[in-house]
Amino acid sequence: MEQQPHQSKSASYISKLFVCTSVDCKDEIEEKFERSFVNLQQQISGLGDKEMHDILSQIACKDKQHDEMSIGLLYIMLTDPIMAPKTYRDITLVSRDGMSVIVANLTLLVAEKYSKLTEGACRQIIWVLREFVKHQVLSVENVIWNCLRQAGGGDVSHKNLYLVENLLDIFIEYRNWLETNPFLVQSIVYSYVRLIEDHSNPALASLRQKEVNFTISLIRDRFQDVIPLGRDFVRLLQNVARIPEFEQLWRDVLYNPKSLHPTFNGIWQLLQIRTSRRFLQCRLLPEMERKLHFLASSVKFGNQKRYQDWFQDKYFSTPESHSLRSDLIRFIINVIHPTNDMLCSDIIPRWAIIGWLISSCTNPIASANAKLSLFYDWLFFDPTKDNIMNIEPGILVMYHSIRNHPFVSSTLLDFLCRITKNFYVKYEDKIRMGVYNSLKLILDKQVIPNLQPLFESPKLDRELRNLIRDNFREFVSPAATNSLSQPLYPTICSIQAPIFKKETDQRIMQCSQDHFEIGEATFNANSDTIVSLLDGENKIVVIPTETLTTDNEVVFSDEDVEGVGRPNKNEENTDDDDDLPLSKVRLKEKPFTEKIELPQTIAESFETFVAKRNSFTWESFLKDFRTLPACTLEEGQLNYVISNAVLVLRDTLPQNHIFSESKTDEKFLAKSISYPLYGLFRFLYENEDKSKKPFQTMLSEICERIPEIGYLLLYFMKIHCKLQTRKNSQHPYQFKTSVYRQICEATDDKIVNCLVRDLDLLEKENTAIYLWLLPDIYREFKSIAINNNEILRITLRCVDAKNVRDIIYSVAQGKLAIFKHDCIIECIRESLDYETYEQFCLWQLIQAHDVPLKSIQDLLPELEAANHPEALSHMLLLLKNEEPTNEIIRLMLSREAKARGDSFVTSALRFWCQRYEEKLSEIIASLLTSKYPSSSPNKRKRPTKSSSASSSIPSADQVLNHLEHYRRSCRHGTGTGLYVHDMMQRALQSAYSHSNDSTKKQFSDLFALAAEDETSAVGRRGGSGRGRKQPLNKKDSNIHNTGNKKNSEILKTVYSSDDNSSEEDWSKHKISQAAKKRKKNIPDSE
């Protein structure tokens, strides 16, 4: 009855900050805000300004109360618009951390709880944000970024539009502040270009025009910040290309890129840059991202329908929301990369989620954009730097759908064939190479066994199969082709004409009014499904992808729409000079029709090099060219020299067997570095002085167009030093890492990034050479390579048992050091996600380096039995060779105790009990005793910060849990001597006396061990604990015997799982041991 008023009071309380229903439970964030507000009100309610300021100043002096006060004041600002200005003034006066607590909690609130905030709180967030920006509060950009994430795409609700417009007003008002933060500029540009697409409704015309004016202005003024947005920014720009301001931007991007920024070379530069995951992430609501992660990581394949239905109802219920599908597909492809364990499990795969998103889309425009999002990375794929996980979903959707859902596979295949040819005709050859690279790597990595079941399926119509044969003839079996034409990607042949120039094509873009216009939501009535593309004349055009019939059956390659919107291919682009093998993909340039005159200082040597194409003439030219000042060469002459030099260097490299067949024969070694490219290395090796600008420019171009240059230089230095040392053994040659640094500077990248990239390419090219160079790499690049996780992973993924043996030999001989003891723990942490075999190899190498346990023992609490079996098994073997110490035991007992116990801890305690039982018992007992206050007031001391931090882990419950599970593991009395030692008995007594009833009940069997000893040793020692036990009278003796019988029954239930166990013998043995130990402690006077 007394609780009823309290219940009614809590029920009547209505939160001013959150919208709550009767079934909602408050979580930690909501409770924290409301609790802080209530506590603050209790202290300042009814006070005047001066008294309140004094109280707030006093509160601010204490860390915990300062944080609570800051949250309470933030609550007031978000819920009381009238008091907000005064509260903000109070915060600025008393805050002693630059408002970092307020900013951090506001960021958390926006990221986690924005959807539950009241309408008034949402308005106040904008007010607070404006004040923060106005006064340039630190880290306010974090709040802004999370607010941008809440401005969802495909949502034209009043709440969302209010947020979008008010954020825009802040950005316009404080433009100067905004431009000082490049990342924020990028996020805003990316977000608003995406949002503009959704605001095509005439009712939103004023908002849309404001967005367009601001976004275009920001893009043009800060284009150097926009360039890193990469290819997905181009994809978004296509969707708004018909808006006049964006159309003019497209003209400048295509025809006058230097007007936007001096370093901008055109649209292909953007298309080659992979868009950062953070920008793809910022276009998804945080709540939506969490739901998507749950779907892709926790839902079993076959059980996903109800989750998908919920997702459909929640996020795809309006016509505008269809545009969201492209954002989701790009996010899934580029951000959600499942581990190997997840790929092998029965969790719903990414391709199934993407297939659902595409097949459930009823809007033809959104459907076409969703397909473009699926294949977008294919068009520009470079296997040397792009991730296969970005192209895997596309092929798997088609491959797994061909049997039961052939219309999905047919639609996607038709789209892929057409987009390859029509996305951007000027660069069709490069895009076709990207798609070829994708399919080639898919087969090389066995993502699917082969393409024949897909490309030659009888479920595809005849026109589509012909289209596939025309576009992917290399991947279609000869039996499926009537007459095989010349391969589309032949191997490179010798180039007879050594004079080249860049193709220039300055055509005028003409915009046809009957073309598709996503920005205005209008399109050609003759085409049902269309996608915005760039044709050969750089016009924004359309391409038909499919025609939907009334019964939802799909018709592909319809003759009526075959030619609609398909631009004529430029007749000049008919040769195949651009087709190179997969590992040598570098596009060539068109030849000059006339020769360019060069300065006399280099003309003769250059012509000789071009004619003879050998290393000697190349080095002669380099001697003349190295000191040539920049003023001597015009830009056209420099381009002429660089283009021809690069092509000759690339053409003279062997296509196969680029490395020596023998690692000892001098003839083979010398021949393998006799090509002109190695002449450049030799020249740099002998001339380390700073070169003139033309030489540096040429070196940069060579590095850009020949990606193998890095690992070929490492190979050259190994061979060159080996050969020179053999010629003159008294003066051994050494690696000159300074030469490699020159190459890194030419690529404008850090040496660590270059080294990792080059070693990765080398391992993929030739594992044997990679392992041969490995000791030299770790010796010469010691500061970079040692403890480098990326290089270590490259090594582990390629070694077999013999390779591991050879590496261990090198380590044992002192020729190779892969680890330093100091930071090796980070390497092991990183390796916990590696494949099992890779982890076993890693631990072999760790053992070879004699890494002491103290260097890695901090990992003990982090390792989980279910997820890290490899690391735990090796750690246990290391522990077997160690004596138990206070620190090791503390870390081990800090491990989380599962319901069934921790077999790792139990195993370690068992084998230590065999050799160090008494020491182990004392260490655990002292650790357990330290968790409780001392019984003697004279021994109470104020703990220091360091001691309190270390003593807080493990907790008393953790220690008791591990002791309990260890007790359960003991069978027939083996290993239980741990509990009979004096210190352990006292520790258990102390634990029992300081435990609450639930703990006593939970560990009753464990405490019973101390209880038994209490009757025979501890509890009957008199006042001082030193006197001899008094003899018992007959009555007491009977009681005592009864107690022993009860204890015996307890012991039997604790230790026996077997009817025939000899618990009586164990009890007698244990008691006799305790008696012997007690006898030693009796003073002589007794």
From Swiss-Prot:
Domain of life: Eukaryota
Region annotation (Disordered) ranges: 558-581, 932-955, 1015-1086
The keyword Cytoplasm is assigned to this record: yes
Pfam families tied to this protein: HEAT_Ints3_C (PF24566), Ints3_N (PF10189)
Residues the record lists as Phosphoserine modifications: S1056, S1057, S1061, S1062
InterPro entries: HEAT_Ints3_C, INTS3, INTS3_N
Chief location: nucleus
Start-end of Basic residues biased regions: 1069-1080
Keyword terms of this UniProt record: Cytoplasm, Nucleus, Phosphoprotein
Low complexity biased stretches: 946-955
Subunit structure: Belongs to the multiprotein complex Integrator, at least composed of IntS1, IntS2, IntS3, IntS4, omd/IntS5, IntS6, defl/IntS7, IntS8, IntS9, IntS10, IntS11, IntS12, asun/IntS13, IntS14 and IntS15. The core complex associates with protein phosphatase 2A subunits mts/PP2A and Pp2A-29B, to form the Integrator-PP2A (INTAC) complex.
PANTHER family found in the cross-reference section: INTEGRATOR COMPLEX SUBUNIT 3 (PTHR13587:SF7)
Its job: Component of the integrator complex, a multiprotein complex that terminates RNA polymerase II (Pol II) transcription in the promoter-proximal region of genes. The integrator complex provides a quality checkpoint during transcription elongation by driving premature transcription termination of transcripts that are unfavorably configured for transcriptional elongation: the complex terminates transcription by (1) catalyzing dephosphorylation of the C-terminal domain (CTD) of Pol II subunit Polr2A/Rbp1 and Spt5, and (2) degrading the exiting nascent RNA transcript via endonuclease activity.
Official protein name in the record: Integrator complex subunit 3 homolog
